[in-house]
A protein has these predicted regions:
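C-terminal subregions of glycosyltransferases and related glycan-biosynthesis enzymes
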Residues: 154, 203-280
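Nucleotide-sugar donor-binding/catalytic module of glycosyltransferases
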Residues: 1-219
Length: 280
């Protein structure tokens, strides 16, 4: 088995068929599609069973609701492919994408993580495309800083060597799980490659956590950013490094406004938070 495609499913009956049709047209040999029904209550699980019927490459796992991370981890436990990738059940993958990516991986067998281009917020006024360079990065840290990877820590527009997840799991009970997990994978001294080939189509969702984040979610995002900066040995003094720290400062202001908590222990942060509060 070459590629395991893991698709968590939770109450997405309106988009699931569109998503799965984009996967089934990929025409990749040695591919399995793992549908992880995370306790859906809208008939999504039944639709998954229906679409998997008569399709040998596709299988369905029904489980109690545990959240996105738990569903992805369940898929990883079932996966048999040399490589794994994730697709959210309201998104699509452009035709020919997986064939192009697997061909590239076969020509570069030392690549551990292959990231490909993504159309962000498809169907929304903020829609744009992130077209990645065709490049093999000298180190994960160089990739992280020079590509400003914290701006595109999507789990879904990447193909991973499955063995990377032997000691890494997605964090159950947390939101912004991609920002938590991707730096941990990168910290394993991996070989990263980016490509302009293929396209992941990430649809805008008005109910997503990135749109409706509350104080708890903002706190978890800031914690994930702080952890990423530590794992990737980011320097606040570098030009690109400062961009991440600036984002962390903005998140700290959000967290302080919503919860009153100060997580960043920089000497000037408490003063900035108080000034921000007094200027509201």
């Amino acid at each position: 088995m070459e590629l395991s495609v893991i698709i968590p499913i939770y109450n997405v009956r309106n988009t699931l068929r569109r998503c799965l049709q984009s996967i089934l047209c990929q025409q990749v040999s040695g591919m399995e599609v793992l549908l992880i029904d995370d306790g859906s209550t809208d008939g999504s699980g039944s639709l998954a069973d229906e679409m998997a019927m008569g399709c040998p490459m596709m299988s369905v796992c029904h489980k109690a609701n545990g959240g996105l991370s738990d569903a992805r981890n369940a898929g990883l436990r079932l996966a048999k492919g040399r490589y794994v990738t994730f697709v959210d059940s309201d998104d699509e993958v452009a035709p020919g994408t997986f064939a192009a990516l697997m061909s590239l991986l076969h020509r570069n067998e030392d690549t551990d993580i292959l990231e490909y281009s993504v159309r962000v917020h498809a169907g929304h006024s903020s829609e744009h495309e992130l077209v990645l360079p065709d490049k093999r990065w000298p180190s994960a840290r160089v990739y992280w800083e020079e590509s400003e990877a914290w701006e595109h820590t999507y789990a879904c527009n990447k193909v991973y060597r499955r063995t990377l997840f032997a000691r890494v799991q997605f964090p159950s009970g947390r939101v912004f799980e991609d920002m938590w997990t991707i730096p941990q994978l990168l910290s394993q001294d991996v070989r990263v490659q980016t490509t302009s080939l293929g396209l992941y189509i990430y649809y805008w969702n008005k109910d997503s956590i990135t749109v409706s984040a509350d104080g708890v979610a903002m706190t978890q995002l800031l914690e994930a950013q702080m952890r990423a900066a530590r794992l990737m040995h980011m320097s606040m003094l570098s030009r690109r490094g400062w961009k991440l720290y600036r984002s962390m400062l903005y998140r700290q202001l959000d967290v302080y406004r919503l919860t009153g908590r100060i997580l960043l222990r920089w000497p000037f942060v408490k003063l900035i938070c108080r000034l921000h509060k007094s200027c509201r």
